[in-house]
Amino acid sequence: MGHEDAVYLAKLAEQAERYEEMVENMKVVASADVELTVEERNLLSVAYKNVIGARRASWRIVTSIEQKEESKGNESQVTLIKEYRQKIESELAKICDDILEVLDKHLIPSAQSGESKVFYHKMKGDYHRYLAEFAIGDRRKGAADASLEAYKAATEVAQTDLAPTHPIRLGLALNFSVFYYEILNSPDQACHLAKLAFDDAIAELDTLSEESYKDSTLIMQLLRDNLTLWTSSEPSRC
């Protein structure tokens, strides 16, 4: 299948909400080992986000039911739920491993612009973070370490190549701060990172470009919402 056909089919699959097929089409595009256009990059991101998002939502629901049944002492149900949760976890792991391989083999080595380097390293951080959400023991530690490393690599490039108001730089700060809060259990670090990103963007609001105004201000609002939430639950830490 040619590059253009794969992109067209990915768009078609998106319209049809057939995200697994959208992923397969975008993997064809990614394997060409050339820098993707902004549109192609976004298609790839949307495809994986939908495929992983549905399962992350399922995992949260099932985990919550498991905890309720456990507290009631319903052992036979807990056994069934546990097996079902593990089935979802193996699907999550497969998707994460899949995109992480695509990133390491094709997308990161082919990235030329600072913007795409930040985008892909951030994505790498995100999918290792998703693994860390459900992994335990050494696997959790490995995923958390890899996530931290990827977010740090993305931040390094973002600080030199992207304006503080750039939506990709802001999105990175948002996700990196969530990683500190949820995975590393470091609310002080999470608040510091989110506040710094928000304040830096506010200070340079005049650099906000017309086309990214909506995206940037939305992410700034999300950073602010998280800060409000974290400050109310951890007043002494934030």
Swiss-Prot record:
It comes from the Eukaryota. SMART domains: 14_3_3. Disruption phenotype: Diminishes colony growth and affects conidiation. Decrease in the expression of transcription factors brlA and wetA, components of the central regulatory pathway essential for conidiophore formation. Increases the expression of nsdC, encoding a transcription factor necessary for normal sclerotial production, ans subsequent production of sclerotia. Also increases the production of aflatoxinvia the induction of aflatoxin cluster regulatory genes aflR, aflJ and ver1. Pfam families: 14-3-3 (PF00244). Belongs to the 14-3-3 family. 14-3-3 family protein that plays a role in the morphological differentiation and secondary metabolism biosynthesis. Required for normal fungal morphogenesis in an environment-dependent manner, affecting the balance between production of conidiophores and the formation of sclerotia, resistant structures that are necessary for the dissemination and survival. Acts as a positive regulator of conidiation and a negative regulator of sclerotial production. This is 14-3-3 family protein artA. The lineage of its organism: Eukaryota, Fungi, Dikarya, Ascomycota, Pezizomycotina.
